[in-house]
């Protein structure tokens, strides 16, 4: 988080650039399946990212779309001057979530272990800054 210190008369005011984030925890999809989708939208504008995610048939794309929309909604709620055109996807992280382990009965009294994987998705969006040089 970046901050700037500004002096107003005798008072010192600290201006903080907010981080607009959203998290999805224990979402029912394997991180291995969601990471390639996350790589497609990282660094793109919000509108392009949503367009890409809507066009994908994957379950992970739908989960990622919800988290990205939530992060953008948080940004527009906390900063009333922001619009959808001014937002881009800054950080997307997909981590391992909780694993659900089950026993799967097999022939001749044996048993196999079935592991269902979940994932945590973290998305941070930021506003586009025009660089004038």
Curated annotation (Swiss-Prot):
Entry keyword Ribosomal protein: yes
Alphabetical GO CC annotations of the entry are:
cytosolic large ribosomal subunit
The keyword RNA-binding is assigned to this record: yes
Q: Where would you find the membrane-spanning parts of this chain?
A: none
Keyword annotations: Ribonucleoprotein, Ribosomal protein, RNA-binding, rRNA-binding
GO MF term list: rRNA binding; structural constituent of ribosome
Q: Which GO terms describe its biological process?
A: translation
- InterPro entries the record matches: Ribosomal_uL22, Ribosomal_uL22_bac/chlpt-type, Ribosomal_uL22_bac/org-type, Ribosomal_uL22_CS, Ribosomal_uL22_sf
Q: Name one Pfam family in it.
A: Ribosomal_L22
The role this protein plays is: This protein binds specifically to 23S rRNA; its binding is stimulated by other ribosomal proteins, e.g. L4, L17, and L20. It is important during the early stages of 50S assembly. It makes multiple contacts with different domains of the 23S rRNA in the assembled 50S subunit and ribosome.
How does it associate, per the subunit comment? Part of the 50S ribosomal subunit.
In which family does this protein belong, per the annotation? Belongs to the universal ribosomal protein uL22 family.
- What this protein is called in its record is Large ribosomal subunit protein uL22
The organism encoding this protein is Borrelia garinii subsp. bavariensis (strain ATCC BAA-2496 / DSM 23469 / PBi)
